[in-house]
Amino acid sequence: MYRALTWWFLAEGADTGDAALIAARAAEPSIEVSADPDDPWTRVNGRDVSRDIRTNEVSAHVSVVARVPAVREHLIRRQRAIIASAGQGIVAEGRDIGTVVAPAAQLKVFLTADPGARARRRAAELSADAGETEAAQARRDRLDAAQSEKAADALLLDATELSLDEVIGEIARLARERCLLACAGDKSS
């Protein structure tokens, strides 16, 4: 959601460094996210921006936007509402989901990976330069260090050598262990 809001400010030509402007306009766009794992999308004012929000340009500005207290308050409220409305549970991702947004979550996984591996994955996703992507991610990691702390009760999962399917499989296994996914007669464990 932070990326979607940042994308919107950039599309509007707004100065993302103007905290007063960002605070005043943070609630203007309609930001929707899909909770369906088979059909993930992010929309801003009805436009699908799922790919647009993953660019290096958005990455370069999102930390500045996310640090504005009014933005954090607004989006944390929105994230909590989405989680609360999910009924049977939801998989949520973000730098402070387990520590701020949903500290009482039944399963928290702190996903990490070697910076080079993260950059290669993002660059492949965007058809971008891996070196430029790694530099942008390193800048964001430095800016977002406070929001990237592992919750005391979170499990650490290093995905450096894992494929996306392997990461999903491991998280599903952890959820089954805690009976957060079907347990009775579940033969997929």
Task: Describe each PLM feature range.
Residues L10, A14, I31, R142, ...:
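Generic secondary-structure signature for well-ordered alpha-helical cores
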Residues G46, L75, V91, Q137, ...:
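Residue-level signature of catalytic and energy-coupling elements of molecular machines
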Residues R3-W7, R77, A81, R173:
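Short, residue-level hotspots on alpha-helical faces of the histone-fold
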Residues S50-A66, A70-E125:
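ATP-dependent NMP and nucleoside kinases share a basic, alpha-helical "lid"
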Residues Y2, A19, V68-I76, G94, ...:
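Amphipathic alpha-helical transducer elements in NTP-driven molecular machines
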Residues V44-S50, F110, A117-A128, Q147-S189:
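NTP-dependent small-molecule kinase module
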Residues M1-R54:
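N-terminal phosphate/diphosphate-binding loop that engages ATP/GTP or pyrophosphate donors
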Residues S34-D36, Q79-G87, I97-A104, A128-A172:
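Small-molecule kinase domains that catalyze NTP-dependent phosphoryl transfer to phosphate-bearing small molecules
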